[in-house]
């Protein structure tokens, strides 16, 4: 890793329908083999379903679901004198969003519904209600951090 300069984050173009950078990032995470239009169609269909179920605005419903999955702490391995400790660290805001979106997409892919749009809509509505696989993943990460709170002084 070169140490000359810090490379800034790439600017992401907002999505064409809602003008949200967060949604554009979500589409990019869902995208497989560079098929962006397919990923966009899936996300927009899922958001439409989610908005009908919740009675909220598309972006607002998506934001609520994402909020319930965002982790605040995680554990990182730290080697100290021959033994490895799981040290709890706070998650940076950009990584919070990335992890939440990744977990939602992973959970949706594992579901057994008919179409990906339906799976995604179901996972997002579960996340909005604080249940589902993605929320369980966040709770597991938080539980792990809580269990290893004793090693917090090894932070770097």
From Swiss-Prot:
Biological process per Gene Ontology, one example term: translation
GO molecular function: rRNA binding; structural constituent of ribosome; tRNA binding
Keywords (A to Z) from UniProt: Ribonucleoprotein, Ribosomal protein, RNA-binding, rRNA-binding, tRNA-binding
GO cellular component, one term: small ribosomal subunit
PROSITE patterns for the chain: RIBOSOMAL_S7
CDD domains in UniProt: uS7_Bacteria
Domain of life: Bacteria
Family annotation (HAMAP family): Ribosomal_uS7_B
Subunit structure: Part of the 30S ribosomal subunit. Contacts proteins S9 and S11.
Name of the protein in its database record: Small ribosomal subunit protein uS7
Organism: Pectobacterium carotovorum subsp. carotovorum (strain PC1)
